[in-house]
Amino acid sequence: MKTIKITLPEELQSIELHTFADEHIGDAHCDIKRLQERIRHVAETPNAYCILNGDILDNATKTSIGDIYMQEFNPMEQLKRAVELFAPIKDKIIAVTHGNHEARAYRKEGLVVSYLIAQQLGVAERYTQTSAVIFLRFGRTSGHTHNRAQRYTIYVLHGSGGGRKEGAKAIRLADMASIVDADIYIHSHTHLPMIMKQGYFRTDLSSSTCQHVTKLFVNTAANLDYGGYGAAQEFKPGSKDTPIIYLDGTRHGMTARL
């Protein structure tokens, strides 16, 4: 688990946080037009930022699950395309994680392609091969005389497992809270867009008090049209609509919408 500290301008009254995950660049069923549109939105929206949360590349190999013959281009070309696509928003990337599709190259050859993407984009210090806790600060508390920024903690990882059923995927998402205390939890991998909230009593040692807080949980979608491996294995068609997180810079408030 890596800690990443991000401080954004205090002038921001709110931010949009977009997650790019399970894009599967190189797969014949990747909706590249939709990906380009989402990247363009982040680039053109001053208060929009993003996380790259694994499986950016399809990265099928001869010895992995998947079909190398259904890929539009090879893994090296996939890496180059990913860097070209995300270059316009490289300054808006707050974290990059490692997915199971990128892990194919690591298991066989020790090559960490997700790190290479982060390095080429100039955000290697924001890369993690496992998970990350992001300490995000921006804005200014309304009416506060000490210029205090709003602070949010985000626990993010690509994820694993989850099964085929929606309930199992929801449990996988909720279980993130048993690992670390955070305001927001972001999970990908299971291709099911999902948003939920839970209450929690957070202790404060300095004041010897407990405060009731709300935690936000987000599971992201896959950017794939139906077909190929998913159809052959009888997986359900998935929605490509993925949650966007909205954070308030004047008070502690967080929501997500599909």
Q: Can you annotate each of these PLM segments?
A:
Residues 4-128:
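Core catalytic region of metal-dependent phosphoesterases/phosphodiesterases
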Residues 6-18, 135-154, 212-215:
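Beta-strand-turn-beta hairpins that frame and shape the catalytic cleft
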Residues 153-255:
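Conserved beta-sheet core of the metallophosphoesterase superfamily
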